[in-house]
Each structure stands twice: as structure tokens, then as C-alpha cells.
Amino acid sequence: MSETDSQETAPQGDLPDFERSVAELEALIERMERGEQTLEEALRDFERGIHLTRHCQKALSAAEQKVAILLENSEDGDVGPFRPDDS
């Protein structure tokens, strides 16, 4: 296994931020789809993928809750479309 591969599959207790988790999941999927892994490597990557997926799901749920709270606490509850040019 290359150094890059070992960095992409960090220990299960080391859960990175959402964006890095998604990137690691994509790398795991690509590696598994190539079908060049041993059974042990594939199982290890699958297990890591499950942990990363759960981490991402929790992060998304937390973000959804924050958005819901922010919308609840807004003055009129109505949020207009995003316009990046508005200052």
C-alpha cells in the first residue's frame, strides 16, 4: 500500500471535518471499484467508509438543525434567495 493510501484511510477514531471525510470516501470508493485490493484491504476500507458515512450524516444533521434554528429565530421566518453581490 502506498503512503497516499495509508493517509487516506486514517484510524477510525480520527474523524476529519466534513469536506475531508467526503474526499476520503471518494478515494475509498475509487480504490474499491478498481478491484485490486485483497479481501482484508477491501474490508478495512469498507469499515472505514461506514464510519466516515456516519460522521458525514451526523455533520449534515447538525447543519440542518442549525439552519432550522436560525430560520426559527429570524424576524419574519422568510429567507430570500442568496445573492452574493448584496453587501
UniProtKB/Swiss-Prot annotation:
Broad EC category: hydrolase
Primary gene name: xseB
GO biological process, one term: DNA catabolic process
UniProt-listed PANTHER family: EXODEOXYRIBONUCLEASE 7 SMALL SUBUNIT
Primary location recorded for the protein, binned into one broad class: cytoplasm
Compartments where found: Cytoplasm
Entry-linked SUPFAM superfamilies: XseB-like
GO MF terms, alphabetically ordered: exodeoxyribonuclease VII activity
Record's keyword terms, sorted: Cytoplasm, Exonuclease, Hydrolase, Nuclease
Protein name from the UniProt record: Exodeoxyribonuclease 7 small subunit
EC number in record: 3.1.11.6
One GO term describing the cellular component: exodeoxyribonuclease VII complex
Entry function: Bidirectionally degrades single-stranded DNA into large acid-insoluble oligonucleotides, which are then degraded further into small acid-soluble oligonucleotides.
Family listed: Belongs to the XseB family.
Catalytic activities: Exonucleolytic cleavage in either 5'- to 3'- or 3'- to 5'-direction to yield nucleoside 5'-phosphates
Subunit field text: Heterooligomer composed of large and small subunits.
